[in-house]
Amino acid sequence: FFFAMCHLSLSEKDYPEPELIEGDIVLDESTAFAVVDTKSSGKRRRKREVPGNRIELWNNAVIPYVISDKMGIKGRKVIRKAFRNLARRTCVTFIPKQAYHNDYVKFIAARKGCYSSIGRKGGEQVVSLGDGCLDRGHVIHEIMHALGFFHEHSRFDRDKYVKVLWWNIQRGMERNFLSYSHYPVDSVNEPYDLFSIMHYDNKAFSRNGQDTMQSRKNPYLRFGRHRSLSQVDIKQLTKLYNCPTPPRRSRGFCYNKYSRCSSYAATSDACEKSYEFMKIYCSKACGFC
């Protein structure tokens, strides 16, 4: 996946900058187990294990959310596009946080760019989106982390499909290309997917503009930089969250009843503040379906 370091002039000072692994994953109590690895040279693959620790999923595939007041019009538009893409193709649902929701995601604009925790953490958890992250692909990628997904190229079988060109990687960034043991990366028996929205692109963390990863089958194949879920991504989400097959929603079900819905959704917090009304009359613009 195309990783962009991104910064904003307006920062949300109330949120401390977290320690990150693999560029955009928050290192917390649960993911800390995942980065414990055995000693070996930086150029060899190291398997990482998560003993007795499980990533928590969201109940009934429902994600309560809050969008920061500092998120501008562009950010709100892109977040809602990501909601629509996921809701249309899977059973995942995004609804504004209500008083009875204890666990929820807050989308913020912070100094350190794009990042998310893995899975449901309990209480408020942050998805950070800076200027360079405000496109649909980046937002979906970070939401997928929050849904419980690691990077595709961290899979235990990665080296069968991808060759890592260690000599082209920026010094000190080699740790971003280590692979996990079979657990905690749960591929739910789906094949390795070069076109997953969770896969780095060919030149991720390149020190010289050359490829850092290549397909073993076709070194010239370009991957990463995807803007939408791949078919394998959809299958994995469907299995992980026990979604109905096909998804319970369809394009024909999702529409706006007012011509100004898109404007309301993009320029205000109407989707959140007037949820019951907007759910009925502007469900598509708000990304509720």
Language-model segments: residues:
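Metzincin-family zinc-dependent endopeptidase catalytic domain
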Residues: K39-E56, I67-K203
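Amphipathic alpha-helical protein-protein interaction segments
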Residues: G72-G75, C133, S187, F223-S230, ...
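Surface-exposed beta-strand-to-loop junctions
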Residues: E56-I63, G119-G122, T212-P219, S262
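Residue-level detector of conserved, well-ordered beta-strand and adjacent loop positions
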Residues: V66-S68, I108, S128-G130, L165, ...
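Compact disulfide-stabilized, cysteine-rich extracellular microdomains and processed peptide cores
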Residues: S196-I197, R225-H226, Y241-C289
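Amphipathic alpha-helical interface elements that mediate macromolecular binding in regulatory proteins
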Residues: F3, K77-R84, S196, V232-K235, ...
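Disordered inhibitory propeptide/activation segment of secreted metzincin zinc metalloprotease zymogens
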Residues: F3-K74, K81-R84, T90-C91, S206-D211, ...
